[in-house]
Amino acid sequence: MSKKMFIRQAGNTLLNTPLLNKGSAFTLEERKNFNLIGLLPANIETIDEQVSRAYEQFSLFNSAMEKHIYLRNIQDTNETLYFRLINQHIEEMMPIIYTPTVGEACQKFSQIYRRNRGLFLSFEDQDELEAILNNAPNTHVKVIVITDGERILGLGDQGIGGMGIPIGKLALYTACGGISPEHTLPIVLDVGTNNSALLSDPMYMGWRHPRITGDQYDDFVDDCLKAIRRRWPNALIQFEDFAQANAMPLLMRYQNQFCCFNDDIQGTASVTVGTLLAAAHATGKKLSAQKVLFAGAGSAGCGIAEAIVAQMVSEGISVQQARSQVFMVDRWGMLEQEMPNLLPFQKPLAQPASLRTEWQIEANREISLLDVIQHAHPDVLIGVTGVPGLFNQEIIEAMAEDCERPVVMPLSNPTSRVEAKPEDILMWTQGQAIVATGSPFPDVVLAGKRYPIAQCNNSYIFPGVGLGVISANAHRVTNEMLQQASITLASLSPMLNGGNMLLPPLSEIQNVSRKIALEVAKKAVEQGKASHRTEERLLERIDEEFWYAQYCEYRRIAS
């Protein structure tokens, strides 16, 4: 506790301030100076003794949901202890504080609600936005995660229950990326809900109204974002879990106005490209020489596809050639240029009609996932559909028929929505597939051999991107910055050093984030999106911003 902090809070006010509370770790001198004598048990503990007790209590709970609620209670009581506990048990606790458990927490948000965290910007309060933002407990906000709760993971419209996602994401910004919780703020836009179960639930805590749409929605979001910029002009804004109809349009509208990005589109794309680059080392085949098949052609799938195209182009092939190697399949079959009602972001990825003729597929039926596998012979299969079991034995065996080491990535969250289970993929390919999933899965043992399953988790990317952006004081997040994050992640793959894991273990996530932060910051400077700084100074800035879960020594300021 060498670092000193001067504060005014005392007594129960101090104990009820999660960012400052130390609980049983307050020293005797602090207990006297801050009117805490008698408010705490006599024994003075270290933070590691507190962690031991907290972990023992955590281990007593049986269900993941109970553990999630317990950890959230610690977060709302003592944030330093919370993050110290998370950091010491990151691999065990990440699935509890975020996917897959956070999905259930969002569904049950109103039932398990205990204490306020973050801001709720309700359409009913649209004339009070400035006042609401001024009510935020954290005044020096640097990173904001914002959602409207309409597309929570694969679970659909959860209304204000979607607040669980920004809370969880920002916990990972801190646990993985070292961004002080003091500088983070979760926000949910309460624009109503179309979830009839929530509207009829007497416990639902949000605005009981069908979702606003059209100009009303666009104007409200615009008002909110501009109010946020006036309040915190340099804050990084991460869009999270907006529905397909809004996600891409919002990104396109604001990415050149604000320091912002969409994690579902760009973060998922970045970690996927990083994972594919790592897999390319294992297969010995450059990404630009591979064919990639997508199941799912929404904003997330197309965002990943465009990032793959950009990486292929950076390896020396033309955009036209790269697009010809990427195949998008949705519920109506493979995207074709002649299809009516293609969305703007789908059109560049649609294949020409001549391909149907070349493959000799009759005009009156859709081109299925299996059709593409049998005719295009892809190297990579990526799932972003939320359709469990979509990658069945026939699909996986067809992938392996013409590809010695197919890369299969069922990325849908939560676990209940995954397109295929890793153990099935490996069994159907006799252990030859390279598997990465969006949700956490245990290692698979097949024929006496252990196969680690890489979790293609955005937490490998966005914490480092955030740290890099705020350390460089960048005013934009560019696709090139995210591409640099992908390349950096791939360079840290244990496979480069003879290991059998695609991605670094989560126990090394802070080191990964720091390396990504430096490369992202350098790219921001190179592109003129941040003021010029040397690499040495950027490293110093990363060190200055990086927050460690340890207690400070308190000195009292007279009220």
From Swiss-Prot:
Sequence positions that bind a divalent metal cation: E240, D241, D264
The keyword Oxidoreductase is assigned to this record: yes
Pfam family name, one: Malic_M
Manner of cofactor binding, per the entry note: Divalent metal cations. Prefers magnesium or manganese.
GO biological process, one term: malate metabolic process
Enzyme active site: Y98, K169
Binding-site residues for NAD(+), renumbered to this chain: R151, D264, N413
Molecular function terms from GO: malate dehydrogenase (decarboxylating) (NAD+) activity; metal ion binding; NAD binding; oxaloacetate decarboxylase activity
Single GO cellular component term: cytosol
Record Gene3D superfamilies: Malic enzyme, N-terminal domain, NAD(P)-binding Rossmann-like Domain
Cofactor(s) this protein requires: Mg(2+); Mn(2+)
Family to which this protein belongs: Belongs to the malic enzymes family.
PANTHER family linked to this entry: MALIC ENZYME-RELATED, NAD-DEPENDENT MALIC ENZYME, MITOCHONDRIAL
UniProt cross-references to NCBIfam families, sorted A to Z: PRK13529.1 (NF010052)
Protein name: NAD-dependent malic enzyme 2
Species name: Vibrio vulnificus (strain YJ016)
Lineage: Bacteria, Pseudomonadati, Pseudomonadota, Gammaproteobacteria, Vibrionales
Gene label: maeA2
